[in-house]
Amino acid sequence: DRLGNEGQIQLVLPSLLAELSVLEAGPVNRSNTDFPIALSAGERRDYTANTIYRDFGWRRKDPDGSLRISPEDAATIGVETGDQARITTLVGSALARVEVTDRMMPGHAAIPNGFGLDNDDGTRSGVAPNELTSLGDCDKFAGTPHHKFVPARIEAVA
């Protein structure tokens, strides 16, 4: 079936052709008034590669895997770098230390992968991205959760 009349391989997959029309419509806005922030749950940072997380020396600058947000969102929410904030998604909630940075666009936030694990001393550092990510909100072909766009709400913690 993959060889055409000219003896060339046919790469067109009919099951995917209909999906291409979605691209013409432009970006999908998955945020809403209850969850206005696009959370990247599992941002790759230079010190979160797999189990490097367990070596505290690698993460001296950011021991808790901070929640990165834009200055605009920080002002709206009422938080500054070092403050605690609550991240809430459809499936979970967690506390995180805030890092305000112009590396984040307004309406977007990020937490790193490799955190939320229990330490040998019984403490827990950072947020486990999977606890905020819905298994019901997945890519329809691959079946993987949309870790890079989790609708979320962020609130200041007094």
Q: Where do the PLM segments sit?
A:
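Long, contiguous, secondary-structure-rich segments that constitute the structural scaffold
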Residues: 55-68, 72-158
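Long, low-complexity segments enriched in small/aliphatic residues
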Residues: 1-57
